[in-house]
Amino acid sequence: VRSSAASDVYKRQKGDSVSFSLDIPVKYGTDVFVAGGGPAGVAAAVAAAESGTDVYLAESLSCFGGMGTSALVPVFMQMTDGINFLAAGFGSRVRKMLDSEKSFSGGAHDIEALKRVYDGLAEKSGAKFSFCTKVIGVKASGGKIDYAVCSGLGGIFAVKSKVFIDATGNGDLAYMAGAKYEKGGENGAMMPGSLCSMWCSIDWKKWRANRPDMPQPQSFKVKEAYEAGVFSFYDPHMTGIMEIGDGLGGGNIGHAFGVDGTDEDSVTRALLHCRKSMREYKNYYNKYLPGFENAKVAATGSAMGIRETRRFVGDYVLNIDDYMKRAVFDDEIGRYAYPIDIHPSGFKGGELEKHRMEFDRLYKYAKGESYGIPYRILTPKGFSNLYAAGRCASMDRLVHGSLRVMPGCFIMGQAAGIGASMAAASKTSVHEIDTRELQKKLIKFGAYLPNFKS
């Protein structure tokens, strides 16, 4: 493959530029290429490989799981609608394997155990994969991608594939191919990021005996602490530290406002800010919260927790009307029920109260309620062999606030993987596969599709 750094893949905005070209070896030829090994990517790779398809996955970090492992995000968010297990299929396997290791408390999960679970599922499926391997370009023409260009530890190489699945979160592969996308809200503002953390030396029994009865109880002294100078910034929205095991906790605390997860300089500033702020959070917990008097920060994530960047425009945009009417679709690949959770991008007045009202009441479903996820949100317009699965799929910003979390990514990923296998085998455009046949295969894989009628 011949590639040029000055190709139209990259739009130079300002400053100097350098032009060079090189011959890139084609290291792999495969049926399905998966960019990204987070919850959507690993689900896609496993589902495609178990369908009898040759699969290669490139993951830029050192393990599968993305935010749930490298970024230390300690919770999946809800997998059920209170009655039915919505993340069935790949999510069922993950949950069962964590349970077998006694590594899932019902809320938080053991991050090292989750890494092993993903490793085992990927290896058993027969999918090929490489860690420490980042997609840095694509070769595409006429609405069809032919090659992904990757940078690994041994240098740059290309992968030729029939079908490509973008499960990078940010939609890096689809972006480099030129697919149309939206980003953030109407004014471009995106949800803040968080740097999650691991904590030790917590007396959970004491905390449970003394915790206040209120939403986000670990935040109840934040204002007092800010006024006392413990915090150099005011951020009252704090999910908190969740119990993982004996004295251990997973922290989802603090925000990096204004971070753009597609800009390395912005993410660098966010990481610096969040690591500095951990000292302030430690002081807060030690001084104000019972059971945390001796708590210590054991580790912070090696990746920034990013909630929102690009959403690629597909054959259908899942929207707030669909969410509110608990929509059912003919091409449904699953259903989901997590409330819309858009973290405020600042606290000038009333933002947190509005968020809590929306999350706890306006957008909260009753038990057994859910909304449908149509296959068409996985297929970006303009490309015959490209899927976007995970938080970069086609949805408006409000629904993205619900579906972006890990169980939603499992549902989308497994559908993209099986769909890609079908498209590769039949040499069919991803926009034209038989969705009823896809649904049958998803049910065989274990997916929850209550509205499918055979």
Language model segments and positions:
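Glycine-rich FAD pyrophosphate-binding loop
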Residues: 50-67
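N-terminal Rossmann-fold NAD(P) dinucleotide-binding loop
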Residues: 41
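Feature captures the FAD/FMN-dependent oxidoreductase FAD-binding
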Residues: 97-174
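Gly/Ala-rich phosphate-binding loop of Rossmann-like dinucleotide-binding domains
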Residues: 45, 49
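Beta1/beta-strand and adjacent pyrophosphate-binding region of the FAD-binding site
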Residues: 26-38
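Single conserved hydrophobic/aromatic residue that forms the stacking wall/gate
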Residues: 1-10
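Flavin (FAD/FMN)-binding glycine-rich loop and adjacent Rossmann-like elements that form
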Residues: 152, 156-163, 167-454
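N-terminal glycine-rich dinucleotide-binding loop that anchors FAD/FMN and/or NAD(P) in oxidoreductases
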Residues: 71-101, 113
